[in-house]
Amino acid sequence: MSGTNLDGNDEFDEQLRMQELYGDGKDGDTQTDAGGEPDSLGQQPTDTPYEWDLDKKAWFPKITEDFIATYQANYGFSNDGASSSTANVEDVHARTAEEPPQEKAPEPTDARKKGEKRKAESGWFHVEEDRNTNVYVSGLPPDITVDEFIQLMSKFGIIMRDPQTEEFKVKLYKDNQGNLKGDGLCCYLKRESVELALKLLDEDEIRGYKLHVEVAKFQLKGEYDASKKKKKCKDYKKKLSMQQKQLDWRPERRAGPSRMRHERVVIIKNMFHPMDFEDDPLVLNEIREDLRVECSKFGQIRKLLLFDRHPDGVASVSFRDPEEADYCIQTLDGRWFGGRQITAQAWDGTTDYQVEETSREREERLRGWEAFLNAPEANRGLRRSDSVSASERAGPSRARHFSEHPSTSKMNAQETATGMAFEEPIDEKKFEKTEDGGEFEEGASENNAKESSPEKEAEEGCPEKESEEGCPKRGFEGSCSQKESEEGNPVRGSEEDSPKKESKKKTLKNDCEENGLAKESEDDLNKESEEEVGPTKESEEDDSEKESDEDCSEKQSEDGSEREFEENGLEKDLDEEGSEKELHENVLDKELEENDSENSEFEDDGSEKVLDEEGSEREFDEDSDEKEEEEDTYEKVFDDESDEKEDEEYADEKGLEAADKKAEEGDADEKLFEESDDKEDEDADGKEVEDADEKLFEDDDSNEKLFDEEEDSSEKLFDDSDERGTLGGFGSVEEGPLSTGSSFILSSDDDDDDI
């Protein structure tokens, strides 16, 4: 209790101290008058009573009637309007309590203004002249319809549509009984349409009724109930979009019945099989491109899909118009593509041709992909190259293309069949005759069998000189390959540069006479003709003519090489490689050069032939005896033709022998060139005569002539030389199976050509 009193006394003392501190001038000039008014500093007079506030722990002036009167006088609420500067702690509370009535005072006036606007909206409306697009038409026929009225008024402008119902804003007025009164209202989209209708439609007649057009004026007739008025469309964006749609330049829909969208899609079946894409997935792109090119002929393609997993091989093509799809169906239905007859039909709009991949198929595909990733880089490259080659083989332009209808394709097949039947008998006859001629020429001479037995085997299987392996004519294969590597290149170059046969013959003769080896030039010619022309009929004719020229040079070069070897020894190595003694001495040198040549198999045989001379002579004798018996049967058939050609060739041989003798005496090279050129011209003239006689079988006769010349030259060579054993020794037993194999291969090729 005592503590409370002390606290109260301390507060009182503090308040007195503050009052003394700020209230020193109470007795001075600022002292208020006896009326108790506060001084200029706003301090209360000394006679103001105070009371203790227990809650706030402070002294406050005691509120009495005098205090309230003074407070009101200070804040302008007195009757006389006098203001005072008295302030108090309760001023703020009193002011906030008095302010709300002041703010609420103007509310009744605002409410009245708002009420007035609403009343204005509920009344009649007025349309401005500039925005009035309505036209009132009177004098219409009583039997007119809404559609006819719309058609009439649309000639002068675009009629506005209702944004909610999307119907034209036109109206035909009716009387109480529901009959048309003969007047109507039309609302245009633009103001310019109103002026146009007034100018053109006014005073016009329809079915004898004269029309009158004016701008619509809206007047209130009777009582107007605003509650029944339709609500305004506040969706201005929808209204604006509809107006823009009416103002654009898109053509109107056709009056006829519109076709469905799914009629634009064409479904094509039996285009492929899903198994076709497993080996080469790129075939899918080729088929898609072929289909796009073909379907673009019928119209604009919007979308093209291939359902590669569908077992029926389905493809869908979407066109812009249904008419284009109809044209595509009419054209493609029943046609052939890639060996399959396809079907084309319109899509029903519901069938889904997409085939989803099963879980098992997905696992297999992922397993194959994982195996591909784990495979080494080399195998990947091989697979890529195989896929590329496969795609090239199955290109769209070669393997797959659209063919005509079945009737047309059958007619084409018949025409091609008749063409093949017409050509095949000619080819068979030519091939048969050339084969028979080759066999006959091989049996013309018995003495030549020992020397050219491997050559005959090759010629039996290869009368047309189509393969390099089956055309070794002599036993000197090693020396031939060596000479070819040294001097074969100029011969080839001369033949390729000059398209004429005579220039080729001269170049070949000159080379053969310089080197003293005709056999080498024959092999070169065989290889060159095979590389340049290939296994065709033209190459057969060229080879036969060239070989006949080479035999002439062969006869001369063989005799000259044997004689020059006796005189000069080892001085003319390159010119006398056809001789026997030089081959014995230079076996090792030839083997090294043979490794660089193209025919490595026959070159190895040449080295073995030198070592087995005696054994090979006996075996060649036996082989030649067997062949003589077989070839005697063919000798009689073409005896007449071969005799005539042999006479011509003997005359050529004599001229060549004279050229050889001149070469031994001096300036052998220059004279040999001149003689060979002269003889070659004679041979060319003789061949032109033969070509004129037998144009159809020119190829066969050239082959027969070739074989006769070779046999006669070899026969004469053996007559002049006593070294048959040595020459025959160059063809070893190992050449027999090789030649037989090559002849088998070539005979199979001939069969293929016949087919």
Swiss-Prot record:
Keywords associated with the record: Acetylation, Activator, Chromosome, DNA damage, DNA repair, Isopeptide bond, mRNA processing, mRNA splicing, Nucleus, Phosphoprotein, Repeat, RNA-binding, Spliceosome, Transcription, Transcription regulation, Ubl conjugation
Phosphoserine PTM sites in chain numbering: 387, 403, 407, 409, 445, 452-453, 481, 485, 494, 498, 521, 529, 557, 561, 579, 597, 600, 607, 616, 624, 642, 676, 702, 713-714, 721, 748
Residue stretches making up the RRM domain: 133-218, 264-349
Keyword Membrane (UniProt): no
Chain positions found as N6-acetyllysine: K297
GO molecular function, one term: RNA binding
Region (U2AF homology motif (UHM)): 259-353
Compositionally biased intervals (Polar residues): 405-415
Superkingdom of the source species: Eukaryota
Free-text comment on this protein's domains from its UniProt entry: The RRM domains mediate interaction with U snRNPs. The RRM domains specifically bind poly-ADP-ribosylated RPA1.
Protein function: Component of the 17S U2 SnRNP complex of the spliceosome, a large ribonucleoprotein complex that removes introns from transcribed pre-mRNAs. The 17S U2 SnRNP complex (1) directly participates in early spliceosome assembly and (2) mediates recognition of the intron branch site during pre-mRNA splicing by promoting the selection of the pre-mRNA branch-site adenosine, the nucleophile for the first step of splicing. Within the 17S U2 SnRNP complex, HTATSF1 is required to stabilize the branchpoint-interacting stem loop. (Microbial infection) In case of infection by HIV-1, it is up-regulated by the HIV-1 proteins NEF and gp120, acts as a cofactor required for the Tat-enhanced transcription of the virus.
Subunit organization: Component of the 17S U2 SnRNP complex, a ribonucleoprotein complex that contains small nuclear RNA (snRNA) U2 and a number of specific proteins. Within the 17S U2 SnRNP complex, interacts (via UHM region) directly with SF3B1. Component of a complex which is at least composed of HTATSF1/Tat-SF1, the P-TEFb complex components CDK9 and CCNT1, RNA polymerase II, SUPT5H, and NCL/nucleolin. Interacts with GTF2F2/RAP30 and POLR2A. Interacts with TCERG1/CA150. Interacts with (poly-ADP-ribosylated) RPA1; promoting HTATSF1 recruitment to DNA damage sites.
Record protein name field: 17S U2 SnRNP complex component HTATSF1
Gene giving rise to this polypeptide: HTATSF1
